[in-house]
Structure formats: C-alpha cells, structure tokens
Swiss-Prot record:
Listed InterPro entries: Asn/Gln-tRNA_amidoTrfase_suB/E, Asn/Gln-tRNA_Trfase_suB/E_cat, Asn/Gln_amidotransferase, Asn/Gln_tRNA_amidoTrase-B-like, GatB, GatB_Yqey_C_2, Gln-tRNA_amidoTrfase_suB_CS, Gln_synth/guanido_kin_cat_dom
Record's catalysed reaction(s): L-glutamyl-tRNA(Gln) + L-glutamine + ATP + H2O = L-glutaminyl-tRNA(Gln) + L-glutamate + ADP + phosphate + H(+)
Subcellular location per the Swiss-Prot or TrEMBL entry: Mitochondrion
A GO biological process held by the record: glutaminyl-tRNAGln biosynthesis via transamidation
Subunit structure: Subunit of the heterotrimeric GatCAB amidotransferase (AdT) complex, composed of A, B and C subunits.
Protein name: Glutamyl-tRNA(Gln) amidotransferase subunit B, mitochondrial
Name of one Pfam family that matches: GatB_N
Transit peptide interval: 1-22
Alphabetical list of SMART domains matching this protein: GatB_Yqey
Assigned protein family: Belongs to the GatB/GatE family. GatB subfamily.
EC number: 6.3.5.-
Catalytic EC class: ligase
Amino acid sequence: MIALLRWGIARPSAPLRWSRCFATSTEKGDEGWQTVIGLEIHAQIKTGKKLFSKASTSYGHVPNTNVDVHDAAFPGTLPVLDINAIRLSIMTALALNCQINPRSTFDRKHYFYHDIPASYQITQHYNPLAWNGHLEIREGDNGSKRTFNIGIKQLQVEQDTAKSQTVGDAVLVDLNRAGTGLMEIVTDPDMRSPEEAGAFVKKLQGLLRRVGSADGDMEKGNLRVDVNVSVHRPGMPFGTRCEIKNINSVRFLQAAIESERQRHIAHYCTSPLEPLAQETRGFNELTLQTYSLRSKEEATDYRYMPDHNLPAIIIDDGYLDSLWKNLPEMPWQSVERLVKTYGVTKRDAETLLGLDEYSAQGIAYFEEVVEQDKKIAKKATNWIAHELLGQLGKAIRPWTPTIVPAPLMHELVTAVESREITGTTGKAIVKHFVSLPESASLPPSFAELLAELGLTPSAASVEDLTETCKKAMNNQPKAVADFKKGNEKVVMRLVGEVMKLSGGKADAMKAKDILLDLLKD
C-alpha cells in the first residue's frame, strides 16, 4: 500500500562532481578525446489528469481550457495528489531496476518566470521516489559498439510547467500543461557517444509505453531531454560540463551531442589556457548547432523547502511486491524470447513488437498464429511481417489483430506449407482481407473462405497439369530456348506462366518437376 504522512526532516542529496581538463595547442582533430554524456529526461505521466488537480491532460486543446484553480495558483487552493501517478512512477522505477525510497517527500523549488504561476514548482529535491537503478544497452542497439549499463541516479515526480511564447513585446502563456505530472529520470554520466545516448532514449521510450506510464512521444512534448556533455583526454578528469535543454527527437539529440562535442574539442585545441565557460545551451534544428542561452558559472539558488501541504509518501514491501509481479515483459525481453524460442530474426521480432508497443498485441497475435508449432514460426513471421503488413502499407491502413484473424492466418500458413494451396492463393486471400471494411463478416471456416473466393485447390490430374505446362512452354518460346542453352533458372519463368494459366491454383512444385522433365526430353 501507499501511505501519506506529514513531512519530516529532509535528507539533502550530494551533487555530481565535474572537473576540467585542457589540451595543448598542438593537438589537432578529435581523436584521443573521450566524450562524457549524462541525460535528464522529463516524461509526462499518462494518467489523463494532472498531478495535483482533476484537470485533463489531453493534447491539442484550446489554450487555457484544461486548467484547474490549483494549476493557476489561485490563493487558498490545496494540492490533492493523484495516487495513480505514484503507482505508475513506481512501476517505471522497478522496470529501471531502481531502489524504491520507502519514504519520499515533496519540496518547493522557487523561481519567478512566466511558466510557473505559483512562483514555485512542486518537485522531489531531498527525498526522491527512487534511486540507484540501471538500464542495459546491448552492442548494436542504435549503433552502440559495446554492452554496458547506464546508471539511473534517481527518478522523481514533479509538476510540469506552462507553455509560454513571446510575441512582440507580449508573452503569451498557456496553462494547459501546467501541473501535469512528470517523471524526471536522471542518468549517471555513463554514455560515451551520441549513439549510446540515442539507444538509451529509444529503450526508455519502449519501457515507458510497455509499463503504461507514459507515451514517450517527443514530437508532442510528452518526453523532453536535457543532455550534459563534456570531453576530456582518457585518464584525465572530466572536462567542463555544458547542458543542452529541451531536445525533442533522438536524431536531434545525437546531432546536439556531436555539435557540442566538436565545440569543446575545438576550444581545448585552439585556446588551451582559456577555461571553457559552463553554460546552458539550446539547439538549432536548422543548422544542427548548439547556441548559448545563459551562463551556469554560478548555481541558481532555488531555495528548496519541504511542501507543508503534501504528506510524505510511505511505500511498504507488500505493495512493491504486488507491483513487481504485475510488471509486463519488457520490449527487449520480448524480442529476445521470440528469437530464442521461435528462431525468427531480430528484425522481424522488432517489427512484430512495433505493431503495438503498449500491450504487445503484435507478439500475442504471432504466438496465436503459431499455436506453439515452432515449425511454421518463420513462415508465419514472413506472412505477417512482410505479406500482411506490405498489403496494409499499400492500402494505407493500420494493423489490427482482427484484419486477418489469427486462427485463419494459422490455417493459411499451414495450408501453404502443406501445399494444399499455393503461395499465390495465400497472397490473394491476404489481399482480400485487407480490402474488407472493418464491419465485414468473415466466413466461419477456411474452406468456406476458399470457396467464396473461388480459390478452392484444383484437383487437376497429372495429365491436366502436364497439358498446362506444355501451353506455358508454347507461350514462352524464348524461355525454352534459354533453358536449352544451359540457363536453368528460366524454369521459374515458366512456372509463373503455369500459375497464370491456372489462375494460381496449380501446385508450383509439381509444375516445376513436370516442366523440367519436358524440357530435358
């Protein structure tokens, strides 16, 4: 269970320590430099309402319509904590292998700006919800060249700010986002390349969606990334750290890191005696370069203090155990299991995973199609990931598990594999399903479906198939001549002609055998 108690003595946390190093003026290029990267990620919690009020968090509404009196900081209003936001945050922390703080508290971070109506933000400075976790990055993830763990320093729950926009001399403020619950996830500076940072963000997005705690949509601002970058010579202390704020895509994250990395190296190579200024920087998406926002040489005094209006959060072991048992299979675990159990490729497994990142319907659909018959697993993957999704792509239609019901897809795959129907017939069936409206009723059995479409397997005799093969040879004299000259691959062109003449009903393998016999006579 989660219990809420009045706040007590707060425990300050120790800040990360970063130091500087310098290069000599004779050093050229970026070889021999090591980049150090740490991330601060803000993910909006997917509860449908704000952290301390009942206002909606729906995206795209008219400005200043999703606002409660507490979000606008009306005097006398009190925060009411959404316990579901805490539950989802704890599940995220468990998935990140974090230690859960048995007693966490809320604090006020004071500053004056347009986007903070109360002039303070409710956060967790002294006693965060969780800490000391990690997320493993595998070699090959987003181009990562090593397998390693990225440490999670802490996960804390806090309020999001409003949006503000400067128009001429005026500043327009939209309070729709103000008060939305955020998980702030702070990593240790364990990443050494833009690709590793991108791999972490991508993996975290999948984790958040599978847990159900956040959408992780960077384009909508549901997930925002601040990145800290420094460079140094191997074996030397870390260089001066600069922070790049509010990056909204993985591609831009990697470009921002590379731009900042090159800027630091250029400074140390050209001005080795001049300290690099510690700054907060922005990122220009057009030039793919960072630019200075403000100096960070002096730490801002936010005058943190415990929030008297909010009780402490007390979490017992029994509640944690129940959440741990209900954690879903993580995306990378699903991919590994499919590869190991069914022998499918990692790429195809990731394609199935991508059909539904939230509840893994694509993987459940695949396993229902296979019905524990590992012999057809690879073929089933081909039919789903390539044929079905290919047809859906042409029709500009999203995948759902009802377009081709799993039992019918299972019968289709097994029928093709047992040569009851041809691959051409199977493709025609898939195309038929894709063309049907969602409300269309389906035949009760696979046999009736074939009959309805006029695709019932032909019971033609060997003699009939031989006659069809002879017609195909007459229609393709050049292919016959090429075969006689030693080009045996052209037999497949003749098989295609047989399938065309038979309306796709002929057995392609039998047709090939007969054609080879006829061609060698």
